[in-house]
Amino acid sequence: MGSDFYLRYYVGHKGKFGHEFLEFEFRPDGKLRYANNSNYKNDVMIRKEAYVHKSVMEELKRIIDDSEITKEDDALWPPPDRVGRQELEIVIGDEHISFTTSKIGSLIDVNQSKDPEGLRVFYYLVQDLKCLVFSLIGLHFKIKPI
């Protein structure tokens, strides 16, 4: 698959149900790792791993390229807070970028930020990535990821 691509996304918080989070990563060899931890109603952590075809990896790269996220900077984005944090790390070609911000509830939060254009790019990219991962996990394991 080539070692020029890696993606990791994390969103989570620590609250009355402990450390609840969603995390996934795509490794250069095509391995998709997925973890979803919720202690709500004594749920257990869901961990799944699968290998995806190189065409999926190419589509992932296309989604990232089309989003133009590599042109963004998180300096003016809301910092992580008690509501939670999001992290996105991407290695694509010679570029290595990493973003950290608070959880985003809706586009209202995006529009009220100091960098609505940049945060909007992040927001929609994350929505696309989560949709893709949930579909892959759901289809591969026949489970509901949430």
Swiss-Prot record:
Known tissue expression: Ubiquitous. Detected in brain, heart, liver, lung, spleen and testis.
Induction trigger: In macrophages, strongly induced by bacterial lipopolysaccharide (LPS). Levels reach a maximum 6 hours after exposure to LPS and are lower, but still much increased after 12 and 24 hours.
Keywords on record: mRNA processing, mRNA splicing, mRNA transport, Nucleus, RNA-binding, Spliceosome, Transport
Keyword Nucleus: yes
GO molecular function, one term: RNA binding
GO cellular component entries: cytosol; exon-exon junction complex; exon-exon junction subcomplex mago-y14; nucleus; U2-type catalytic step 1 spliceosome; U2-type precatalytic spliceosome
Gene Ontology BP terms: mRNA export from nucleus; mRNA splicing, via spliceosome; regulation of mRNA processing; regulation of nuclear-transcribed mRNA catabolic process, nonsense-mediated decay
Compartments in which it is found: Nucleus
Protein family per UniProt: Belongs to the mago nashi family.
Subunit structure of this chain's protein: Component of the pre-catalytic, catalytic and post-catalytic spliceosome complexes. Heterodimer with RBM8A. Core component of the mRNA splicing-dependent exon junction complex (EJC); the core complex contains CASC3, EIF4A3, MAGOH or MAGOHB, and RBM8A.
Protein's job: Required for pre-mRNA splicing as component of the spliceosome. Plays a redundant role with MAGOH in the exon junction complex and in the nonsense-mediated decay (NMD) pathway.
UniProt name for this protein: Protein mago nashi homolog 2
Organism: Mus musculus (Mouse)
Name of the coding gene: Magohb
